[in-house]
């Protein structure tokens, strides 16, 4: 009877582990359709969606927006949060301060060109003082998800 109880306990423990964390790798996040047309990344307990201008062939003053959600895609209030986006394209580096812009949105402006090689590092400091960071390649072409079930969240 003890062996059966241990087996049942072990089985219950395995079942409680759920699906692998691979459901949140960058490739899976890139295949997801985002609410604002940006690129999605995980940062700690949060999802950050980075939206940059896609049609600026030369560097000029352009907006940058980061949307904050939790892993259940529920909006997180941006009030009291602040952030910084570092954009890298070729030899050009641009740092843009982000401030709350309503609802779950932080935004700022800075000079950058829309390039498929554009890379971004986003750092968000939440009202409780915790800072989360994520890396993006926001203008890389999307790769379709070939899973018959679509991207899993």
Task: List each language-model region with its residue ranges.
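Intrinsically disordered, low-complexity terminal tails/loops enriched in metal-binding residues
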Residues: 2-5, 17-153
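Hydrophobic helical h-region of N-terminal Sec-dependent signal peptides
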Residues: 9-13, 17
């Amino acid at each position: 009877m003890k062996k059966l109880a241990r087996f049942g306990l072990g089985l219950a423990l395995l079942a409680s582990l759920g699906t692998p964390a691979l459901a949140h790798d960058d490739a899976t996040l890139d295949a997801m359709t985002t609410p604002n047309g940006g690129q999605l990344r995980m940062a700690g307990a949060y999802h950050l969606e980075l939206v940059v201008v896609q049609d600026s062939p030369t560097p000029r003053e352009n907006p940058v927006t980061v949307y904050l959600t939790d892993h259940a895609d529920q909006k997180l209030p941006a009030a009291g949060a602040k952030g910084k986006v570092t954009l890298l394209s070729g030899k050009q580096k641009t740092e843009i301060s982000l401030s709350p812009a309503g609802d779950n949105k932080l935004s700022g402006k800075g000079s950058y060109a829309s390039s498929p090689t554009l890379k971004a590092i986003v750092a968000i400091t939440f009202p409780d003082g915790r800072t989360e960071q994520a890396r993006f390649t926001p203008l890389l072409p999307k790769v379709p998800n070939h899973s018959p079930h679509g991207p899993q969240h």
